[in-house]
Each structure stands twice: as structure tokens, then as C-alpha cells.
Curated annotation (Swiss-Prot):
Function: Part of the ABC transporter complex LsrABCD involved in autoinducer 2 (AI-2) import. Binds AI-2 and delivers it to the LsrC and LsrD permeases.
GO molecular function: carbohydrate binding
Gene encoding the protein: lsrB
Protein name: Autoinducer 2-binding protein LsrB
Organism, scientific name: Photorhabdus luminescens (Xenorhabdus luminescens)
Cell compartment(s), UniProt: Periplasm
GO cellular component, one term: ATP-binding cassette (ABC) transporter complex
Keyword hit for Cytoplasm: no
InterPro entries, per the entry: Bact_Solute-Bind_Prot2 (IPR050555), LsrB (IPR030159), Peripla_BP_I (IPR028082), SBP_2_dom (IPR025997)
């Protein structure tokens, strides 16, 4: 009898260990950028992986080598098939990933977006660096701080005509220009397609085509340094170069005076927040508008309605977490940041 009881206890222990191992294995989160090899996304990935270690969750950072729907869909499908139970993706297209993401959700995978959103029905929570009016407004204000002419010529230059986040910011920026700077002329809107060489060529082409250009607004991590390098190559120090990129990439241009102001947010914290939110979804099942989470070294973040991003779609377990702050970098503060 004693032997039988011991065998049963041993069996229960083995089953408990098996269950614990299965649960631990299931706590895997994939963190996907638009593409690898770009400092902005690498920094976000570092924040995500560090958060995973702090939480005891396995976080994998991986992305395509080129920004494409097909590349991201392949990664999403691979992660789902490998048993990952949460995916956080910076989407190259608002709709192109939706079929794959909806299939993943039907299989019980938690889907979140960061940096660049999908249509809201294709994910649960979007970890958002700022609303379109916040970021579009930053772009115009940085240019206006440097352009003193009433009748100025301005070019927009960023990654692609289909990427969600940047097009939302640019729309708001153009609306703000029309309302507050009606005499500014937007002479062109061009794209570098996340390619460093093409971005430099495009930026040089813009400067050559408009010898009297007053500003380039470049809300893209590749486009902004390319515009700054093009201005240096062509000795066009009279053009205001503003936009979004990381301080480590832009530091030399700020130190040389080519760029007076540029903006961003703490993308390391964005990666960290993304993983904390994903982990909370794995524990609770969902998060709803009004729910809050206290994240170490960052503070309290709150789920807000999709309408802050201009969406009409609202649903249970669906919303947006907006980063607490954004930063304008200048020569006076850039050395306080290292990412």
C-alpha cells in the first residue's frame, strides 16, 4: 500500500513538473520590427529583451532584412507554428498583415503592435509613441523654430507611402501647416523605402531639385540622417533638417551644427512597455480601456480608446497605450541619451 502511494505521489510530481514546464515554454513573446539592421529598431528590441529577462519571459527579437509584408507574414506564421503565445509587431502595412494576425488570434495568440499600427481590429493593444497630432505637431514646430521666412519651401521625406505611423504624422503635419503656416509651400513628398543608400540619393535629389528649399521634414530613422548627410555633402547648411531618429545616429550631425533640433521618444522604453503589456495580457486574458499598469522605472501607463489615433473601431480588449513622453534633442541635451 505504501509503495502504491509513493508511486502515485511520484506520478503527481511528474505531472506537475510537466505542466509547469509547459506553462513556462508557452510564455514566449516575439518582438518584430519593420526590419533588422536599423538602430531605432535594434534599440526597441534591446528594451524588449531586457524586459523579458526582468519578467522571466522568453522574448525573441527578429525581423525581415527588408521591410515587406511578405517578410513579416512569414515571421508571424513561423512564430505561431513554433508555439509563441504573444506577438508584438511594428507593421509595415495597416492591412497587409491582418489575415495572418487574425489567424494567429483564432489560435489563441495575443497580438499587439508597437511603433506602427495595423487596423485596430487586427490586434489587441497598440503601444504608441504618440498620437498623430502630437507627433505631426512636433515636426512642424521644430521646422517653424528655424524657418523665419513667411513664404517658405518645405519637403517631406520619409520611408514609404503605405507605412501606417509616418503617414498619419505627415497628414497631421500638413494639416497644421495649412492652418498655421498657409504661405509655406510643400514642394514635394518623397520616400527612401528604409534603404540607407536610396535615402541618401533621394535626399540629395531633393536638395538639387530645389536650390531655394528652406526645410526637409523627415520623420523616419533612415531618412533623417540621410537628409543631414546630403546637406553636408552638398554644403547646404541653410536648410533646416528636422524629423525623428535616434540620438546615437544623429549626434555627429548635431555636434557639427547640421541639425539643430530633432525629436523622438525613448524607444528602449517602448520595447520595455510592449513586453510588460504583452505579459499582462498573457496573465489576465485581456486589457480594456481604463486599465492601468505600473511599469518599473517608467511609471503608470493606461489603456486609452482607439479614437486617440483617429480610429472609429472600439471593442472589448482593444485599445492603445501611449508612451508617457516625447523628447526634442538639441546640442544641449543630446549627450544625456544613449540609444
Amino acid at each position: 500500500m505504501k509503495t502504491l502511494i509513493l508511486k502515485k505521489l511520484a506520478l503527481i510530481s511528474l505531472l506537475s513538473l510537466a505542466c509547469a514546464s509547459w506553462v513556462h515554454a508557452a510564455e514566449r513573446i516575439a518582438f518584430i520590427p519593420k526590419l533588422v539592421g536599423v538602430g531605432f529598431f535594434t534599440s526597441g528590441g534591446q528594451g524588449a529583451v531586457a524586459a523579458g529577462k526582468a519578467l522571466g519571459v522568453n522574448v525573441t527579437y527578429d525581423g525581415p532584412t527588408e521591410p515587406s509584408v511578405a517578410g513579416q507574414v512569414q515571421l508571424i506564421n513561423n512564430f505561431v507554428n513554433q508555439g509563441y503565445n504573444a506577438i508584438v509587431v511594428s507593421a509595415v502595412s495597416p492591412d497587409g498583415l491582418c489575415p495572418a494576425l487574425k489567424r494567429a488570434m483564432k489560435r489563441g495568440v495575443k497580438i499587439l503592435t508597437w511603433d506602427s499600427d495595423t487596423s485596430p481590429e487586427c490586434r489587441s493593444i497598440y503601444i504608441n509613441q504618440g498620437t498623430p497630432d502630437q507627433l505631426g505637431g512636433m515636426l512642424v514646430d521644430m521646422a517653424a523654430n528655424q524657418v523665419q521666412k513667411k513664404q517658405a519651401k518645405v519637403a517631406f521625406f520619409y520611408s514609404s507611402p503605405t507605412v501606417t505611423d509616418q503617414n498619419q504624422w505627415v497628414k497631421e503635419a500638413k494639416d497644421k501647416i495649412a492652418a498655421e503656416h498657409p504661405d509655406w509651400e510643400i514642394v514635394t513628398t518623397q520616400f527612401g523605402y528604409n534603404d540607407a543608400t536610396k535615402s541618401l540619393q533621394t535626399a540629395e535629389g531633393i536638395l538639387k531639385a530645389w536650390s531655394d528649399l528652406d526645410a526637409i521634414i523627415a520623420p523616419d530613422a533612415n531618412a533623417l540622417p540621410a537628409a543631414a548627410q546630403a546637406a553636408e555633402n552638398l554644403k547646404r547648411q541653410n536648410v533646416a533638417i528636422v524629423g525623428f531618429s535616434t540620438p546615437n545616429v544623429m549626434r555627429p550631425y548635431v555636434e557639427r551644427g547640421t541639425v539643430k533640433q530633432f525629436g523622438l521618444w525613448d524607444v528602449v522604453n517602448q520595447g520595455k512597455i510592449s513586453i510588460y503589456i504583452a505579459n499582462e495580457l498573457l496573465k489576465k486574458g485581456d486589457l480594456n480601456v481604463g486599465d492601468k499598469l505600473d511599469i518599473p522605472d517608467i511609471g503608470i501607463v493606461e489603456v486609452v480608446p482607439n479614437r486617440v489615433q483617429g480610429y472609429r473601431y472600439e471593442a472589448k480588449g482593444n485599445g492603445i497605450v501611449v508612451l508617457p513622453e516625447r523628447v526634442i534633442f538639441t546640442k544641449d541635451n543630446i549627450n544625456q541619451y544613449n540609444f
